[in-house]
């Protein structure tokens, strides 16, 4: 045989030591606090605070765009709601909001199908503080 003896890997059962950075609770977190809201009525802005909106497609239908006088609005998929485009733009848009000088980033949810599952996981991790 060209290969050596087969060795079975042991499963790491340690919850405290993640195997990869992506397993950290806040691995995807920007410096600016991020809050993921499931619906517009969950947003209660504080007076004097500057908010940036991470919008899925900028649609008024979602109810987030017209909800507040946002300091900055960044769209993942401008106008069309395509998950593939949103996934490509995800980290760029998150970084733009993080560097915009807002006090807090408010993220509206993304459809949890296909690529949306991964984006929602990243948004949930980014909202951990």
Identify what each model region corresponds to.
Residues 8-9, 107:
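General beta-strand structural signal in soluble alpha/beta enzymes
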Residues 19-128:
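A C-terminal functional module that forms or caps the active site or interfaces directly
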